[in-house]
Swiss-Prot record:
GO terms classed as biological process: ATP synthesis coupled electron transport; photosynthesis, light reaction
Protein name: NAD(P)H-quinone oxidoreductase subunit 4L, chloroplastic
Domain of life according to the entry: Eukaryota
MF annotations from Gene Ontology: oxidoreductase activity, acting on NAD(P)H, quinone or similar compound as acceptor; quinone binding
Gene transcribed to yield this protein: ndhE
EC number annotated for this UniProt entry: 7.1.1.-
The organism of origin for this protein: Cicer arietinum (Chickpea)
Amino acid sequence: MMLEHVLVLSAYLFSIGIYGLITSRNMVRALMCLELILNAVNINLVTFSDFFDNRQLKGNIFSIFVIAIAAAEAAIGLAIVSSIYRNRKSTRINQSNLLNK
């Protein structure tokens, strides 16, 4: 696959993730958009690692590290969303003012 095609795909994923993160009012949707952004970054890491040096796997290893961090972030984020939903009965971002009881 050509480098330009993969970079365009990654740019589309990143743009969709940023747009969803900006316009999202639901916490779960915002977390999903954040994961989409991280996956676009992973695609770039693997693509540039393969394009510049096939013998070294630095981009692939760093991508696996980012996936592990993203999994931990998703687990913690969903736990926080679950806790907020139990207390506030809503997952909307604008209704979850934690400073006001």
